[in-house]
Amino acid sequence: KDVVGAALDAPYRDVPFESVFVADASRHGAHEINEALRAGLDVVLAPGVFELDDSIRMARPGAVVMGLGYATLVAPASGAACVIADDAGGMRLASVVLQASEVPAGDSSLLRWGGDGSASDPSVLSDVFARVGGPGSLNVRANVMMEVAASNVILDNIWLWRADHAELAPGEQPRPGEQYHLVVPGECSVKNGLIVDGDDVTAYGLAVEHTDQDQVIWRGERGRTYFYQCELPYDVNQ
């Protein structure tokens, strides 16, 4: 009674489970996931860490890639993106972590969302987190965490994080007042968190933290953001 919020009786698409491919990080990689998407299946990523050797490619209208337990997609060592989309409308990417690798310096992104997009059936990226840093090496890098070139895309709870702290190396002493390694320029390098070139892109919950240059570059027209968190790097020289 007197509920305020999303209409739970709105039209929806019911996907039978025989139309779903469940990917297991211990047995499946980008090749199997891309084969399933090309065959018209939607993809559920079981909890785990997927060490990708190629990009996951989404191009079919209505295609869905959804993680369980925040499945982690580790970027290919070649510098290719974790996910590349040619937005044909109605596509969904949800509940995944995109993780940077040690890659050559260059024009690398963790996610490239291109294509035309659809005003009548917008694609949605929900609960998508990206990180440059965290576990392991301080030499991971990316040029940009997320690029959205398609129009009419909806971003729902996006967190794009360059590490500010990391685990101490064996024998390393923290700075006074710190318990962890404080990340400095040249470590966990990433220029920008989000670049938007598409028009009519809407973000509901956008957090971008600690990038080396502009946190967000928004060149598309009529963009909207509802809640934006911006954390600058600790070093003012950045």
Feature map (PLM): residue ranges:
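Extracellular/periplasmic carbohydrate-active domains that bind, remodel
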Residues: 1-238
